[in-house]
Amino acid sequence: IDKLLSGRYRHQTPSFHLVHFSLNKKIVGLGGQFFIIMISMLFVFQLINIVISRVAGPMAVTQYNIAYKYFNVLVMSVNIVFTPFWSAFTDAYVKQEYTWMKNARNKLEIMGLLCIPVAVLMVLLSNFLYTYWIGSEVDIPISLSAALAIFAIAQTFGGIYVTLLNGTGKVRIQMLAYLFSSFVALPAMYVSYYWFGLEGIVLFPSIVCFLQAILGRV
């Protein structure tokens, strides 16, 4: 490689004078915003298990995690579809193909709406599938399954606009939303638990995702 770069392909040898240091601030700034988003998301979602363990006990943590993994199948399936759209939105944004971006967003919204009956069906079949999966040792209330189905739908719609915003590099909105949610998460989850029980703890991250979807849509 050294011989090639010093000989025939010398014009392609990396050089410091080709580096545009003026772009550092923009690149580091965008990367920093993504870092804050990831840390805030990690804090909020891990805090759920801690709060449930503190206020409802270890058994409730088991119930939550089983139901969460069950409905996360829907979220993961949707994310597989969303992933290639990130780079596609970036390419379309650079080329100013706004009509394509709007049409793609509309199709993703339709897919999100189609996920609602799927989530309802998953709730209806949840007790049977839980028993088939883990046996009858852990009883998971249908209300908890319904709460996590709503959470899955909230993540789906939030993911639509996150994909669009990430593709265009406009992540400040979601950074502020997650920062705010990380600051109020603990008291909000405690209050939600005492008002609505275990299902109320899941209510807070669902509201965050729906809020993210609304802000992204606007």
For the regions a protein language model found, what residue spans apply to each?
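Alpha-helical transmembrane segments of polytopic membrane transporters and translocases
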Residues: 33, 48-49, 62-78, 110
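Interfacial segments at transmembrane-helix termini and the short loops linking adjacent helices
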Residues: 58, 98-99, 123-153, 199
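Membrane-interface helix-loop junctions in multi-pass transport and translocation proteins
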Residues: 1, 169-172, 182-214, 218
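Interhelical loop/hinge segments that connect adjacent transmembrane helices in multipass membrane
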Residues: 1-45, 88, 95-99, 218
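Interfacial transmembrane-helix starts/ends
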Residues: 27-28, 97-113, 120-125, 142-145
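Residue-level recognition of pore/gate-forming positions within transmembrane alpha-helices
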Residues: 42, 69-72, 119, 152, ...
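Helix-loop junctions and terminal segments of transmembrane helices
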Residues: 15, 72-96, 164-167
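Membrane-interface junctions at transmembrane-helix termini in multi-pass inner-membrane proteins
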Residues: 150-180
